[in-house]
C-alpha cells in the first residue's frame, strides 16, 4: 500500500514569494530531457517547483525518503507517479510494479516507454530529494530512464547534490535545464517581498537588502530571521548578524536558541515527537503525541511558521522541512531518549491501523521492539514476501532473536523461502535442520510438511530428483487441504520429478493439477511454470501441435497477468523457438530466441546459454557456418564460465557436435568425446539428447559399432517411455550411421520409419541438418514413387529445405571469403593471374551448390544469356572445361579454407 503523501505535490502556501524570474526559466522545461534543481537544504527547491507545477495536469510527483533505496519500493512509487500524471494510461506497468513482475528496473522502464509511446501530450515527472538515493542500481536505472525517455517527457529532479545521472553528457547535448543555489538565492527585491509578508511592521528596503546579502539569499535563514523577530523583541537585523556565515550544517545551536527555546514546553514536545514521522496525518499525530485534535494542532504549527508543509491538496498529510525535520529528530534522541522507544511503538501501531505494515516495521525496528516486530511479521510478512519486499523482510528477520523465530516456525519458514528465492540452497537446508533440531514436535504435523515442501523445491532446483520426490510425497501426505501454497509447491515438484524420470503421462496430469490450483489461488508464477512444463512434456511425447496450443495459452496468461519480465518468460519463448525450428520456421525461431535473450538482458550472460544455442541451431539449419562459428565462440566461453543443468549442457553440446559434423572437424569431436559426461540412464529427453550427441560424434569418427549400440538402446528406452520426439531424432541419426556404413537397405528402413513418425511430430529441420546424404536418399525415395501421400509431401518439403540449406552452406564466395582466400598461402597461382569478378565468384558458388543455369539466373535476377557469359568466363579463368570440373575446383578451394565438404 502506497503512502498518498509521497505522491502528492506540495500545496502552494500563502505568504510565499513567487519566483517570477525562475518560473520564466522553467517555462521552457518541456524542451529538455532533464530539469535539475540543486542546492543545499533550505534554498526553496521544493517551493519553487510546487509554484511551477501549480495548474499543470500532466505531472507526477514523487517525494523520496531513505526507504526508497529499496528497488521495489522505488519502482512502485515512480510508476504510481507516472500513472498520476497520465490518468492511469500505463496500466501494464502499474500491474507489473504492484506484483513485482519485472526482471529489473531498466526492463520495467523499457515497458513503461512502450506504453508512453501512445501518450502524445507533454508529460512531467518530479522526483524530490533525490540526494537520499544511495543505491547504485537505482542510479544506473535512472541513467537508462533519461537516455530512453520519450521526447514529450521531462524529468524534474530536486537534489542537495549533483546526482549520478550522466549530467555532463546531457549538458553537452543541450538537454539539461539547470538551476543551482546561486540562482535560487533570494534577490534584494524577493527578500523585501518576503519580509513584507511575514513581519507585522515592514522594514526598510536597505535593511532587507543588507540582511539578504548577509545570509547570501538563503531562504531558510530569512525564514528563521522572520520567525525570531516575531517571537522576540530584538530586531531582524540582530538575528541576521547572528546567522551571517552560518550554513545548513551548523544550524543546530541557532535552532535551539531561536526556535525550540521560544515555544512553550507542550509545543516543544509536540515538535520533537512528531518529527519521528516521515509524513503525518491526524491519526498519526493523535497517537504519537497524545494531542486530541491532531489536524488542528498541525494547522496551528503551520500558522506559526515552524517549517511544517502540506503534502497534498486535501490538507490531510504534512511533513517538516527536511532541514528542520532532521534537526528535530536529532534533538528528540537527546531530549526524549527514554521515551523514544514508546514513541516509535505508538507510530508503528498507528501505521498498522491505517494499513501500512512497511512503515510500521520501520518504527518497530527503530523502537527495538522485537515482540512488536514479530507480531507485525506474523500478520503481514507473507503479503510483503509476495510483493517482493525482500530487503525489508531480511532486515526484520535479522533483528529478531533466534528464540523468537523458534517460537514461531512460520517465521523460520519465511526466512528459508527468502534464502530459496536468492538461490542459497545450502543455507535453506541448514536453517531448517537447525530449527527441527531445536523445536519440539516439529517433526510431525503441518509445519514439518511445509518445511518438506520447501526442501523438495530446493532439492529439484539443486538437481536431486530422488530426494525431491521423497520430500514432496511426505509433504502432500501431511499437508491439510487448506494449505494451498505448499500443496502447489509439492505437486509441482512431484510433476517435475516424474518428468525427469520419463513418466510423462503422470507428470502431465500433475502439472495440469498444479495449474488448476495455482490459478484458483492466484499463484501466477506456479501457474506459468506448470504450463511451460506441460508444453515441454507434450513436445517430448511428439504432440507438437498440442504443445503449440498450450504455449498459446501460456502467452495469454503472461499477457493477462503481466508476467513478461519474469525469467520464466524466457523458458517459454525458448521452447517456442525449438518448436518453430523443428517445423523449419527459422526466421520465427530466431526471433523467439532473441526475445528470450532480451528477457534475460539484465541477468548474468550465462543465463542466455540456451537461447544462444538456439540461435546457433538456426544458423546451422540455414547452412550459415560462418555465423554459427562466431556464435559458438561465445557459447564455448559461457560454458567455461558457469555451472549448468544437464539439459543446458546437452543442448549446448548438440550444436557443437552438429557443427563439427558439418565442417568435418574430427579432432574437436574426438577431444570432446574423451571428456564429455556419459549419463548412467537415458530415461528423459535431457539424457537422450546427450547420448545422441555422443553417438553423432562417434559416427563422425567412424566408430559405427559403439554408436549403433547407443542408438539402439536409446530407441528401446524412447519406445518404452513414449519419448516420440526423441525416437524421431534417434531414427534420423541411425539412418546416417547406416548410410555412412554402406548399409543402404537398413538406412532406407529407418528413414521410412522417421518419415512416418514425422507425420505426428511435424519435424522438418531435423532432417535438413543431415545434409546431402539425406537429400540423396529422399531423391531416391521420391523417384521410386512408393511413399504414402503424407510422407511424399514431407520428403519433397525437406528436399526443398535441404537445397536451400546447401546453397547457404556452400555459397561462401562472398567478398570477405574471397579476400581471405586470396591471402591464403596455398591459393592456386591461376586465381591470382586471372582473378574472378565478384559476380563470377557468386556463380561458382551456385554451380557448386547444384544450381542449373536457369536457377542461377533466377537467384541473381539476370538473363540466362548473361549467366552463360559468366560461366564461360570463369571456366576460362579456372582452366576447366565443364561443370563437374568447376564443382571439383570449388570443392578444393573450400577444403583448403577449412570447410568440411
UniProtKB/Swiss-Prot annotation:
One term of GO molecular function: DNA-binding transcription factor activity
Signal peptide, first to last residue: none
Means of activity regulation: Activated by ATP and maltotriose, which are both required for DNA binding.
SMART domains (alphabetical): HTH_LUXR
InterPro entries: P-loop_NTPase, Sig_transdc_resp-reg_C-effctor, TPR-like_helical_dom_sf, TPR_MalT, Tscrpt_reg_HTH_MalT, Tscrpt_reg_LuxR_C, WH-like_DNA-bd_sf
Binding site for ATP: 39-46
A Pfam family per the record: TPR_MalT
Record keywords: Activator, ATP-binding, Carbohydrate metabolism, DNA-binding, Nucleotide-binding, Transcription, Transcription regulation
Biological process terms in GO annotation: positive regulation of carbohydrate metabolic process; positive regulation of DNA-templated transcription
PROSITE patterns xref list: HTH_LUXR_1, HTH_LUXR_2
Residues within the DNA-binding region(s): 853-872
Keyword presence, Ribonucleoprotein: no
Record-linked PANTHER family: DNA-BINDING TRANSCRIPTIONAL ACTIVATOR DEVR_DOSR
Assigned protein family: Belongs to the MalT family.
Quaternary assembly: Monomer in solution. Oligomerizes to an active state in the presence of the positive effectors ATP and maltotriose.
Function of the molecule: Positively regulates the transcription of the maltose regulon whose gene products are responsible for uptake and catabolism of malto-oligosaccharides. Specifically binds to the promoter region of its target genes, recognizing a short DNA motif called the MalT box.
Protein name: HTH-type transcriptional regulator MalT
Gene encoding the protein: malT
Amino acid at each position: 500500500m502506497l503512502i498518498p503523501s509521497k505522491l502528492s505535490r506540495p500545496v502552494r502556501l500563502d505568504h510565499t514569494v513567487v519566483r517570477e524570474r525562475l518560473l520564466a526559466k522553467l517555462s521552457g522545461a518541456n524542451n529538455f530531457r532533464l530539469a535539475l534543481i540543486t542546492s543545499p537544504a533550505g534554498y526553496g527547491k521544493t517551493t519553487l517547483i510546487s509554484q511551477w507545477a501549480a495548474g499543470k495536469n500532466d505531472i507526477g510527483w514523487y517525494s523520496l525518503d531513505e526507504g526508497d533505496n529499496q528497488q521495489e519500493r522505488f519502482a512502485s512509487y515512480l510508476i504510481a507517479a507516472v500513472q498520476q500524471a497520465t490518468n492511469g494510461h500505463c496500466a501494464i506497468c502499474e500491474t507489473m510494479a504492484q506484483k513485482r513482475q519485472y526482471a529489473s528496473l531498466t526492463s520495467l522502464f523499457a515497458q513503461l516507454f512502450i506504453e508512453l509511446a501512445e501518450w502524445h501530450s507533454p508529460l512531467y515527472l518530479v522526483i524530490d530529494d533525490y540526494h537520499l538515493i544511495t543505491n547504485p542500481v537505482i542510479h544506473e536505472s535512472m541513467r537508462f530512464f533519461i537516455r530512453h525517455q520519450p521526447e514529450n517527457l521531462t524529468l524534474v529532479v530536486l537534489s542537495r547534490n549533483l546526482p549520478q545521472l550522466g549530467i555532463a553528457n546531457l549538458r553537452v547535448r543541450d538537454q539539461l535545464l539547470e538551476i543551482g543555489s546561486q540562482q535560487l538565492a533570494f534577490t534584494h527585491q524577493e527578500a523585501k517581498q518576503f519580509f513584507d509578508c511575514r513581519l507585522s511592521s515592514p522594514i526598510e528596503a536597505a535593511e532587507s537588502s543588507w540582511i539578504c546579502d548577509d545570509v547570501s539569499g538563503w531562504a531558510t535563514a530569512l525564514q528563521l530571521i522572520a520567525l525570531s523577530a516575531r517571537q522576540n523583541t530584538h530586531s531582524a537585523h540582530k538575528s541576521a548578524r547572528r546567522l551571517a556565515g552560518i550554513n545548513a550544517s551548523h544550524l543546530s545551536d541557532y535552532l535551539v536558541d531561536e526556535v525550540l527555546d521560544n515555544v512553550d514546553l507542550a509545543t516543544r514536545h509536540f515538535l520533537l515527537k512528531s518529527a519521528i514521522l516521515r509524513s503525518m496525518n491526524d491519526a498519526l499525530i493523535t497517537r504519537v503525541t497524545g494531542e486530541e485534535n491532531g489536524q488542528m494542532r498541525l494547522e496551528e504549527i503551520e500558522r506559526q511558521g515552524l517549517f511544517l508543509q502540506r503534502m497534498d491538496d486535501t490538507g490531510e498529510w504534512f511533513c517538516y522541512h527536511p532541514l528542520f525535520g532532521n534537526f528535530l529528530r536529532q534533538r528528540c534522541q537527546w531530549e526524549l531518549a527514554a521515551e523514544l522507544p514508546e514513541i516509535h511503538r505508538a507510530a508503528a501501531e498507528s501505521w498498522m491501523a491505517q494499513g501500512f505494515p512497511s512503515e510500521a516495521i520501520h518504527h518497530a525496528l527503530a523502537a527495538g521492539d522485537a515482540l512488536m516486530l514479530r507480531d507485525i511479521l506474523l500478520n503481514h510478512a507473507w503479503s510483503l514476501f509476495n510483493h517482493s519486499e525482500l530487503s525489508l523482510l531480511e532486515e526484520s528477520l535479522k533483528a529478531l532473536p533466534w528464540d523468537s523465530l523458534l517460537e514461531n516456525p512460520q517465521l523460520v519458514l519465511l526466512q528459508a523461502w527468502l534464502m530459496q528465492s536468492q538461490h542459497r540452497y545450502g543455507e535453506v537446508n541448514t536453517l531448517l535442520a537447525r530449527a527441527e533440531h531445536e523445536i519440539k514436535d516439529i517433526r510431525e504435523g503441518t509445519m514439518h510438511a511445509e518445511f518438506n515442501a520447501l526442501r523438495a523445491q530446493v532439492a529439484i532446483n539443486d538437481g536431486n530428483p530422488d530426494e525431491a520426490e521423497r520430500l514432496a510425497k511426505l509433504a502432500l501426505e501431511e499437508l491439510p487441504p487448506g494449505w494451498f501454497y505448499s500443496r502447489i509447491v509439492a505437486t509441482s515438484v512431484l510433476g517435475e520429478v516424474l518428468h525427469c524420470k520419463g513418466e510423462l503421462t503422470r507428470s502431465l496430469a500433475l502439472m495440469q493439477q498444479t495449474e488448476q490450483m495455482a490459478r484458483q489461488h492466484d499463484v501466477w508464477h506456479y501457474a506459468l511454470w506448470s504450463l511451460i512444463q506441460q508444453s515441454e512434456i507434450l513436445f517430448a511425447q511428439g504432440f507438437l501441435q498440442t504443445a503449440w496450443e498450450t504455449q498459446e495459452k501460456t502467452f495469454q496468461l503472461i499477457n493477462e497477468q503481466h508476467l513478461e519480465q519474469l525469467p520464466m518468460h524466457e523458458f517459454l519463448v525458448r521452447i517456442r523457438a525449438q518448436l518453430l525450428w523443428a517445423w523449419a520456421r527459422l526466421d520465427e525461431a530466431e526471433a523467439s530466441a532473441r526475445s528470450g535473450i532480451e528477457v534475460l538482458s539484465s541477468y548474468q550472460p550465462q543465463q542466455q546459454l540456451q537461447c544462444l544455442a538456439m540461435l546457433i541451431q538456426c544458423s546451422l539449419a540455414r547452412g550459415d557456418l560462418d555465423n554459427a562459428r562466431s556464435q559458438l565462440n561465445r557459447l564455448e566461453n559461457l560454458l567455461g564460465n558457469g555451472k549448468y543443468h544437464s539439459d543446458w549442457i546437452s543442448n549446448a553440446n548438440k550444436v557443437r557436435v552438429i557443427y563439427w559434423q558439418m565442417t568435418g572437424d574430427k579432432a574437436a569431436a574426438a577431444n570432446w568425446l574423451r571428456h564429455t559426461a556419459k549419463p548412467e540412464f537415458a530415461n528423459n529427453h535431457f539424457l537422450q539428447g546427450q547420448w545422441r550427441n555422443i553417438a553423432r560424434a562417434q559416427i563422425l569418427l567412424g566408430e559405427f559399432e559403439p554408436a549403433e549400440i547407443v542408438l539402439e538402446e536409446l530407441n528401446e528406452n524412447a519406445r518404452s517411455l513414449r519419448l516420440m520426439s526423441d525416437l524421431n531424432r534417434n531414427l534420423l541419426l541411425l539412418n546416417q550411421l547406416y548410410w555412412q556404413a554402406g548399409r543402404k537397405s537398413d538406412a532406407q528402413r529407418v528413414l521410412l520409419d522417421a518419415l512416418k513418425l514425422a507425420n505426428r511430430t511435424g519435424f522438418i529441420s531435423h532432417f535438413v541438418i543431415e545434409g546431402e546424404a539425406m537429400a540423396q536418399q529422399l531423391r531416391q525415395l521420391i523417384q521410386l514413387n512408393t511413399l504414402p501421400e503424407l510422407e511424399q509431401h514431407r520428403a519433397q518439403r525437406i528436399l526443398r529445405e535441404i537445397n536451400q540449406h546447401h546453397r547457404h552452406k556452400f555459397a561462401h564466395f562472398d567478398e570477405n571469403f574471397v579476400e581471405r582466400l586470396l591471402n591464403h598461402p596455398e591459393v592456386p597461382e591461376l586465381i591470382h593471374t586471372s582473378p574472378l569478378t565478384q559476380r563470377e565468384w557468386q556463380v561458382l558458388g551456385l554451380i557448386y551448390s547444384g544450381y542449373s543455369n536457369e536457377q542461377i539466373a533466377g537467384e541473381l535476377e539476370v538473363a540466362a544469356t548473361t549467366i552463360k557469359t559468366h560461366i564461360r568466363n570463369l571456366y576460362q579463368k579456372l582452366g576447366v572445361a565443364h561443370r563437374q570440373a568447376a564443382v571439383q575446383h570449388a570443392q578444393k578451394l573450400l577444403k583448403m579454407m577449412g570447410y568440411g565438404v
